């Protein structure tokens, strides 16, 4: 059975605007992020989905509530789709940090390895593929989490493709399908802007 996963990056926060690492810090949507989610809602209204999942972080939960407010479906929280931890870098300005440190295999900064982040996101999707009868899912998560999973899929296929910075804008839609034993990225970072 084919499965379709509509993956949504949460709306903007003050730390997004200030270009700070957020990771698992629970930073709420900014006023701009709330407006982004409201503006994106008509795009999500056009999609059919049978279940809604969200990261436990408030910026994802609030985005999920806004874009699905007319649906009569519960929002299910799952820790496996939380953002990647950036350890001691959380709250720091991105431009002030050694980005290379964030991509080593054994991070010494107290954060999460990007491959582990991709692995747990995949585990979440694999559970839905193997143990759930539904076919269409809305998943509100984070740019790092979704992006690391996509990168891992590209690596499996032998592609040396890297997602450019900004490819997953706030409130954007990424569509991933599972069929015939494999995941396929159909759309990345789509917005109607």
Predicted regions and their residues:
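Active-site-proximal alpha-helix that buttresses catalytic centers in soluble enzyme cores
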Residues: 8, 12-71, 112
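General small-molecule cofactor/ligand-binding pocket signal
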Residues: 6, 76-78, 186
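Phosphate-handling substructures
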Residues: 69-123
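Short beta-strand scaffold positions
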Residues: 54-55, 119, 140-141
């Amino acid at each position: 059975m084919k499965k379709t996963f509509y993956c949504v990056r949460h709306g903007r926060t003050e730390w997004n605007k200030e270009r700070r690492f957020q990771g698992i810090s629970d930073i709420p949507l900014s006023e701009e992020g709330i407006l982004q989610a409201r503006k994106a809602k008509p795009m999500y209204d056009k999609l059919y989905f049978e279940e809604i999942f969200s990261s436990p972080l408030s910026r994802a939960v609030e985005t999920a509530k806004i874009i699905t407010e007319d649906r009569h479906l519960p929002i299910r929280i799952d820790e496996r789709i939380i953002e990647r931890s950036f350890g001691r870098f959380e709250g720091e300005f991105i431009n002030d940090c050694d980005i290379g440190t964030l991509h080593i295999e054994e991070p010494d900064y107290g954060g999460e390895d990007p491959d582990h982040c991709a692995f747990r996101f995949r585990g979440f999707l694999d559970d839905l593929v193997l143990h759930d009868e539904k076919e269409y899912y809305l998943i509100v998560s984070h740019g790092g989490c979704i992006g690391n999973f996509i990168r891992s899929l590209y690596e499996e296929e032998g592609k040396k493709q890297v997602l450019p910075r900004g490819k997953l804008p706030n409130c954007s839609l990424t569509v991933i399908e599972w069929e015939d034993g494999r995941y396929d990225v159909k759309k990345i970072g789509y917005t109607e802007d």
